[in-house]
Amino acid sequence: MSNYGLQLLYALMNRRADWACERVFAPYPDMEKALRKRNLPLYSLETFSPLSEFDVLGFTLQYELTYTNVLTMLDLGGIPLHSADRTMNDPLVIAGGPSAANPEPMSDFIDLFIIGDGEEALPAVCDFWLEMKQQYGDGRRQTADGSQKFRRQALLEAARKFPFVAAPQFYSVQYDSNGRPMRPRPNETGVPEIVQPARIDDLDTYEPPILRIVPTIECVQDRVTIEIMRGCPGRCKFCVSSVLKRPTRCRSPENIARIAKESCLATGSDEVSLLSLSTSDYPKFEELMAQLRENLTPLNVSVSVPSLRVNHQLCEVMQQLTTERTSGLTLAPEAARDEMRRRIGKPITNEHLLAGCESAFTNGFNRVKMYFMCGFPEETNDDIDGIIELAHTISRLGRKIWGKSVTVIANVSNFVPKPHTPWERLGMATQGYFLNAHDELKLRSKRTGIALKYHDLETSLLEALLCRGDRRLGRTIERAWRLGARLDSWSDYFRGDCWEEAIAETDVNVNQIVHEAVPDNAELVWEYVRF
């Protein structure tokens, strides 16, 4: 229940009298085993209804390593894995979220991808599907072949009707002389050449839920979350989120403050988190913080700001965030040197970073977490070494102000060139490069006492394969799942051996997809979706 989008769309659909929106999550392997042993279907949390009884089943694809979760849920829910095998008696299977920006790898399993904002798009697609079921019937009085034919026609009408819907089965893919997939092109008349994202103009039109779901057990990020701004004024070359969420739109400060107070009173939460890609870039930040303090201080509710830009405003922001609670500061400098930041399109300086951290320590913060990346183009040893050097400098600064050790964490991820970003044509650095970089970081962190965390390399390479691949990867995903791949984004359950075997069996050219740069004159397989 930590996903803001799920809470928002759940509340939006349930405000309507003609829809009942319920929740279901991928089960842990022990629950999956118990369901299969007892021949029970996967069911919704609200009414324990089997998934196959719903009209529409929607997945949010937040991360490529959740793809096998989709197959687990479809199979446990009694729904055919492949879109082509479903009839009008089966739910419409839709998906949205960041990973839907390249629909191709999951095109065998998803009927329709909703691209862009879901507030208006989801109800429109759901209403349309009910019309199609009324027009063509639910499949119970039809032969399987006839019902599949009607379903295909209904999906085709959706692809023609909605400019924000990607229906991969109505696009054909050809391959160039090097075996690279070209841009998919329509194979039916009336299907658009290019899919355009759905966009809402005014965030205030779609208010976050006040009476949001409160789980009976504590969950990750157990707090009231309010989206204050969608989009980002920054243009970092590696960042896919800023591309997918364009243009920048803001919620009014008075609405944010009111929603925060009402939500805390309704749920009992003692923390409010302001959600955006760069909260300190919110145009009326000082006014917003003043209104939040007025509304929340009497309730003993704290405010969390997880996404802060490192610039000249950071010192002012630290003063605005001063509360009675000692808490942590999270920053994303991405690179340790000013020169590399200019190259990646993130115009911040170490001067601003150090000044902001000094202000944070002075105003009661005793913990700083910083997010970096390694594997950027033209990266040098100085860039790698600089990560620990910068963290060590901040650690010494904190000790000077507090008179004792503060916590400084350097969290290093591996750069994956994502579709739709300015660096989408680049290849990912090799496994050997990352291993050497990680070894150097570990060595230097031990000498300085800096807490170092870095992303697992095997899962980063798999992420690159799944986000940059084409529909041929559908066989690979399914084979890995049948071999036992489950909950791949959870380190306790990740089975790299399943993926290695599946990749070998399905003859995937990993080097071409992951590591080779795509020539400027070559087409990209995700180009039929435009942002």
Q: Which residues does each predicted region cover?
A:
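Short helix-loop-beta junction
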Residues: 8-20, 294-298
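N-terminal pre-triad scaffold of radical SAM enzymes
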Residues: 13, 214-237, 264, 414-416
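Glycine-rich beta-alpha loop elements in corrinoid/cobalamin-binding modules
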Residues: 26-139, 146-187, 422-470, 478-491
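Flexible glycine/acidic-rich beta-alpha junction loops that bind and position SAM and/or redox cofactors
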Residues: 29-30, 105, 172-176, 283-284, ...
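Conserved SAM/AdoMet-binding glycine-rich loop
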Residues: 65, 261-412
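Aromatic/hydrophobic pocket-lining residues that form the small-molecule binding cavity
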Residues: 70, 122, 256, 285, ...
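N-terminal [4Fe-4S]-dependent radical SAM core
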Residues: 168, 174-225
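Iron-sulfur (Fe-S) cluster-binding segments and ferredoxin-like electron-carrier domains
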Residues: 239-255
